[in-house]
A protein has these predicted regions:
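Extracytoplasmic cell-surface/polysaccharide-interacting catalytic and binding patches
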Residues: 1-50, 138-151
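A broad, low-specificity signal marking well-ordered, structured residues that form hydrophobic/aromatic
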Residues: 54, 83, 118
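Extended, low-complexity, intrinsically disordered C-terminal regulatory tails
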Residues: 43-70
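Generic non-transmembrane alpha-helical segments
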Residues: 41-52, 95, 99-105
Length: 151
């Protein structure tokens, strides 16, 4: 099912890890509005990155998948509102994170994660975005405010 011009329902729930572990990663129908909001947000991100294609490493995660991946207990991935993305044709994960903010995309949260990808989430329909900007370099160090280099 196509949610927006460039993002399908299937792309937002795809997980090689879920397939490998035999986990059913299909969301309940009640999360469809959130997945549509995520797809619309990702369209804004794509536009901010010059229309370049995004690589979605992780979108929606059911509780079991999120637990197996070591995700946060209140992860927006489980609500269908977050994606971990890369855009190699645009630049590094940090450059992607900063471009999202500079373009005024209005995400709920942007996290530069481990120097390896950009986590972007959007507010649920009818909710205001927090505009939270964070970096995590290691689990031991935890999150720090702002979008910072890792290394």
């Amino acid at each position: 099912m196509q949610l927006t011009e460039h993002f399908s329902f299937e792309a937002l729930i795809a997980s090689d890890t879920a397939v490998r572990l035999g986990i059913d990663n299909r969301p309940p129908a009640t999360l469809l509005p959130n997945l549509r909001a995520l797809a619309e947000g990702l369209e804004r991100v794509r536009a901010a990155l010059g229309g370049r294609d995004l690589r979605i490493n992780s979108g929606y995660r059911c509780l079991e998948l999120n637990t197996r991946l070591g995700g946060a207990k209140k992860s927006r991935h489980m609500e269908g509102l977050a994606a971990d993305i890369l855009c190699p044709a645009f630049g590094s994960p940090l450059e992607v994170c900063r471009a999202i903010v500079a373009a005024g995309v209005q995400p709920d949260q942007v996290i530069h994660e481990f120097g390896k990808w950009c986590h972007v989430s959007f507010a649920a329909p009818g909710s205001a975005p927090r505009g939270e900007l964070l970096t995590i370099a290691s689990a031991a160090r935890g999150y720090e405010a702002g979008l910072n280099p890792v290394g």
